[in-house]
């Protein structure tokens, strides 16, 4: 009897160790923010147009490119030209760490991301706080090209549900040609829609007090980005876009997106 009890306890202890040591969905999931966790547009006294610029048709987009250089160990430089405004012909994307940069260094990739100019450095000779001519910077936004596109140029629709003051007021879809797509690409497309349809960002302010965009993956994991700038009178585009440096990707067929907004009079 004692032997059987001992064996049962050993099995129980082993099972507990296995549960503790095995990553689980809830542990990896980012909980929804509390109201005090979010930036408030009323506490930002700068120009909201600087935020709007990041999501209003000024993004970097390129297919089948390969890095040609780097500045630091955790970034990659590509020959990508601005076909619309002719503002740049080189793009540097900064990643979370050196390992992530090495992963894509010699790969043929697609690049899609929001870019900035001030505090964009390609070498130690670039002037601090100045715009480097012909060059622009971004974070993340990389996906491997080979095998990551749908057949016959098909596109995948991704559902976005918008909640204003906790009420679902509008739903729409954004499209991507990628099987594995960066959250940044979907975020840009969702916010661009909301700028055009809901005036998400205006020149001086926003009709919304708080906002966050939430991604729900097929395994139940969730994560979100704050959609408003930090309090103060200045908006640092580089610092804000840094949230994309982990190059987070999602499965375009299964991911769901929610946008949660509160109005200033709500």
Swiss-Prot record:
Pfam families: Stap_Strp_tox_C (PF02876), Stap_Strp_toxin (PF01123). Keywords: Disulfide bond, Enterotoxin, Metal-binding, Secreted, Signal, Superantigen, Toxin, Virulence, Zinc. GO terms for molecular function: metal ion binding; toxin activity. GO terms for cellular component: extracellular region. Zn(2+) binds at residues 36, 110, 145, 149. PROSITE patterns: STAPH_STREP_TOXIN_1, STAPH_STREP_TOXIN_2. Its main location: secreted. SUPFAM superfamilies: Bacterial enterotoxins, Superantigen toxins, C-terminal domain. The keyword Transmembrane helix does not apply. Disulfide bonds join 120-137. The keyword Cell membrane does not apply. It is found in: Secreted. Interacts with MHC class II molecules composed of alpha/HLA-DRA and beta/HLA-DRB1 chains. Interacts with host T-cell receptor/TCR beta variable chain TRBV8-2. Staphylococcal enterotoxin that activates the host immune system by binding as unprocessed molecules to major histocompatibility (MHC) complex class II and T-cell receptor (TCR) molecules. In turn, this ternary complex activates a large number of T-lymphocytes initiating a systemic release of pro-inflammatory cytokines. Also causes the intoxication staphylococcal food poisoning syndrome. Belongs to the staphylococcal/streptococcal toxin family. This is Enterotoxin type C-3. It comes from Staphylococcus aureus.
């Amino acid at each position: 009897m004692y032997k059987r009890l001992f064996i049962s306890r050993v099995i129980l202890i082993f099972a507990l160790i296995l549960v503790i040591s095995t990553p689980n969905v809830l542990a990896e999931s980012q909980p929804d923010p509390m109201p005090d966790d979010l930036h408030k547009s009323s506490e930002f006294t700068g120009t909201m147009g600087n935020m709007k610029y990041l999501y209003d048709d000024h993004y970097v987009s390129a297919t089948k490119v390969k890095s040609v250089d780097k500045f630091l160990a955790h970034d990659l430089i590509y020959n990508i030209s601005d076909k619309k405004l002719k503002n740049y012909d080189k793009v540097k994307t900064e990643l979370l760490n050196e390992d992530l940069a090495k992963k894509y260094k010699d790969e043929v990739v697609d690049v899609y991301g929001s870019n900035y100019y001030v505090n964009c450095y390609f070498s130690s000779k670039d002037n601090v706080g100045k715009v480097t001519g012909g060059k622009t910077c971004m974070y993340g936004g990389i996906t491997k090209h080979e095998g990551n596109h749908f057949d016959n140029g098909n596109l995948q629709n991704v559902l976005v549900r918008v909640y204003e003051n906790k009420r679902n007021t509008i739903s729409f879809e954004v499209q991507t040609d990628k099987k594995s797509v960066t959250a940044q690409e979907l975020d840009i497309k969702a916010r661009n829609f909301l700028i055009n349809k809901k005036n998400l960002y205006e020149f001086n302010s926003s009709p919304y007090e708080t906002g966050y965009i939430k991604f729900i993956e097929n395994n139940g994991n969730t994560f979100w980005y704050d959609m408003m700038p930090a309090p103060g009178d200045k908006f640092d585009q580089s610092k804000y876009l840094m949230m994309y440096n982990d190059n987070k990707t999602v499965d375009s067929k299964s991911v769901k997106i929610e946008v949660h907004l509160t109005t200033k009079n709500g």
